[in-house]
Amino acid sequence: MAKKVEAYIKLQVAAGMANPSPPVGPALGQHGVNIMEFCKAFNAKTESLEKGLPTPVVITVYNDRSFTFVTKTPPAAVLLKKAAGVKSGSGRPNTEKVGTVTDAQIQEIAETKAADMTGADIEAMKRSIAGTARSMGLVVEG
């Protein structure tokens, strides 16, 4: 008989840096999941990513307290800030520009996000990411 799903937990955890402190510990603890087991598995799965990069994860908790998880690609905003070399987006994106991204960088981010985004094709994904960049106060070149 298949295991019954008890809960889905969505978190953003720094790649390679999962530990039992908040937000991971409380979110998993309330469902009775072995927190250290998750932390070890998550850190092993994300060791190929840049350490500290915020990585969305969806954890499926079953009624026998076992779990599975799926990692997603980092948010487009995080990848854009990294590409532009800025710490945060602009508070006033229409008047105050904080950095620049090139078309090649947007192409690279679109290819990275292709697994998670539901865009029809790579060009649609590029337009979506360019829109995110503009709303953060980044200038898109190209």
UniProtKB/Swiss-Prot annotation:
The keyword ATP-binding does not apply. It holds the Pfam family Ribosomal_L11_N. GO terms for biological process: translation. GO terms for cellular component: cytosolic large ribosomal subunit. Coiled coil: none annotated. It comes from the Bacteria. Transmembrane segments: none annotated. Gene3D superfamilies: Ribosomal protein L11, C-terminal domain, Ribosomal protein L11/L12, N-terminal domain. One or more lysine residues are methylated. Keywords: Methylation, Ribonucleoprotein, Ribosomal protein, RNA-binding, rRNA-binding. GO terms for molecular function: large ribosomal subunit rRNA binding; structural constituent of ribosome. Part of the ribosomal stalk of the 50S ribosomal subunit. Interacts with L10 and the large rRNA to form the base of the stalk. L10 forms an elongated spine to which L12 dimers bind in a sequential fashion forming a multimeric L10(L12)X complex. NCBIfam families: L11_bact. Forms part of the ribosomal stalk which helps the ribosome interact with GTP-bound translation factors. Belongs to the universal ribosomal protein uL11 family. HAMAP family: Ribosomal_uL11 (MF_00736). This is Large ribosomal subunit protein uL11. It comes from Vibrio campbellii (strain ATCC BAA-1116). The lineage of its organism: Bacteria, Pseudomonadati, Pseudomonadota, Gammaproteobacteria, Vibrionales.
